Amino acid sequence: MTPREIASQAAHAIAVLNELTHGGGELSNSTDVRAIVRSLELIGQGLPQLCEQLARFLVIQHEDGQLTNADGLDPDDSVTEVIEALAAAGQAADMMTAALTEARAASQVLSPARTRGWESRQEAD
């Protein structure tokens, strides 16, 4: 598979997760939430490196004269803009990952409640 195909699959996986979890959909309990958050955390950990590698590729392509601007202008400004945006995306991914780590850690104390029988519910009322 190509990097492009894998990126498309990753985007599709997030879209499917959004569909499956809409309104609680396919979620069973807090353990499901914690597992999904952990997976998102792992994705987030890899995004800064990926953004850096994409930027590095564009720099090399530009230095080798392999990039042109569709408007016929010098591609310097466009390449710089893409590189800066990718750097910002990498930083945002770091922040997202930190928040996901915090969410996962905070969720450790949550567990599914025991189902109480009808008698226990009446006593609680």
PLM region descriptions:
Residues 1-111:
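Hydrophobic alpha-helical segments that drive targeting, anchoring, or assembly
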Residues 106-125:
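Short, charged, intrinsically disordered terminal tails
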